[in-house]
Regions:
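Non-transmembrane, aqueous-exposed alpha-helical and coiled segments at domain scale
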Residues: 1-204
Length: 204
């Protein structure tokens, strides 16, 4: 907020930071739109799940969390006809990754529709390179404007198949704010992108 020049922008940033503090104290989400529950699960290769299905257990946990936490239920059954709300915001979208070790790690992303609707994907020619990725990211952020719920955290996935690139973009937003990619070259690109995204003037 110290670098924001607009008085209105400064006030909005102050209110956003107050909202962050309140959400942290009350253990509530930043935004009322808790949309689709996206769950990323790292399963250690030495972990043995007994007594039932891991996916069923996750969905029961999501349902209990959304119900007991008074979070908005947005998922409907039979979307082409009756559109009956499931009341539990399930089924969740569950991604499972096998990793070394004997631990289970679960990350929950309550992905609101406002920001999800701004997601973009593009297959580029290899010649587009780093510059092409940069242009695509900047164009996407600029065209999205104020539609995604603030604070806007941009996740970028590069490489692999179409669905894997989108998965990587979603996974990127699970990092702590300010935490960079472990690869130095990628981390430097992130810093460059962040500076250029902030220079667009989108936001307060």
């Amino acid at each position: 907020k110290d670098t924001e020049e607009s008085p209105l922008g400064k006030q909005i940033l102050v209110e956003l930071l107050e909202n962050v503090d309140l959400a942290k104290r009350e253990m509530l989400p930043l935004c009322q739109d808790t949309g689709t529950a996206v769950v990323m699960v790292e399963v250690g290769q030495d972990v043995h799940i007994v007594g039932g299905s891991l996916h069923d257990a996750i969905n029961r946990g999501v349902g209990a969390g959304y119900t007991e936490g008074y979070l908005r239920a947005s998922i409907v059954d039979r979307p082409f006809s009756d559109r009956i709300n499931t009341k539990t915001n399930t089924p969740a979208v569950i991604h499972t990754e096998i990793v070394p070790g004997d631990r289970l790690r679960i990350k929950l992303i309550p992905k609101g529709g406002g920001c999800e609707n701004m997601s973009q994907f593009q297959i580029m020619l290899p010649a587009a390179g780093k510059k092409g990725i940069e242009q695509f990211v900047l164009r996407t952020v600029e065209e999205s404007g104020g539609n995604p719920c603030p604070p806007v955290i941009v996740g970028v996935g590069i490489g692999g198949s179409a669905e894997y690139a989108m998965y990587l973009a979603k996974k990127a937003i699970t990092r702590k704010v300010g935490e960079h990619h472990p690869d130095p070259e990628t981390a430097e690109f992130e810093r460059e992108l962040l500076e250029k995204v902030n220079a667009l003037g989108v936001g307060p």
